[in-house]
Amino acid sequence: MILANDELKKLISTGRLKVDPLAPDTVRENGLDLRIGGEYAIYAYEGAVVKPCELENARHLFRIVKADEVVIPPRNFVLLTTEEYVKMPDDVVGLANLRSTLARYGLVIPPTVVDAGFEGNITIEVVNESPNTIVLKRGMRFLHLILVKAEGRALYSGTYQGQRGVTPPKGLRGEC
């Protein structure tokens, strides 16, 4: 069941869902609109051979940029972080979507689930499929998070729990 405006406001007012900072236009009809944070990550190299199964982490492959504008080259991608620090209830899952207006410019994100019990800034991959450089501004609404009631409870305990700022991917050594 998708949680609508009234249910979202109840979760926030009772402290079960935390969104900090909470702007007046964050809670929407059927989800939360989250904003671009103050840093992003982009690949530091082009043409490198990346072998996730051989890496402990991939931080060295990315350049972290602190800026008021996010520059996404044509047919490239960046990792964006939300301005908001989110703490999810243990029985609610988030489904992340790019705001449709941004998709109409050629931006896409992969299907992304924010697990029940997750806490942190959300890092999301944004791909520019267009032939043009696209420039986004810090603080603009970019991510629409649909919240869905889960059957039962779960507690997220993954690598990205408690992350702050943009977080490059972990390596997959030991998982392959």
Curated annotation (Swiss-Prot):
Pfam families: DCD. Belongs to the dCTP deaminase family. It comes from Pyrobaculum islandicum (strain DSM 4184 / JCM 9189 / GEO3). This is dCTP deaminase. PANTHER family: DCTP DEAMINASE. GO terms for biological process: dUMP biosynthetic process; dUTP biosynthetic process. It is an enzyme of class 3 (hydrolase). It catalyses: dCTP + H2O + H(+) = dUTP + NH4(+).
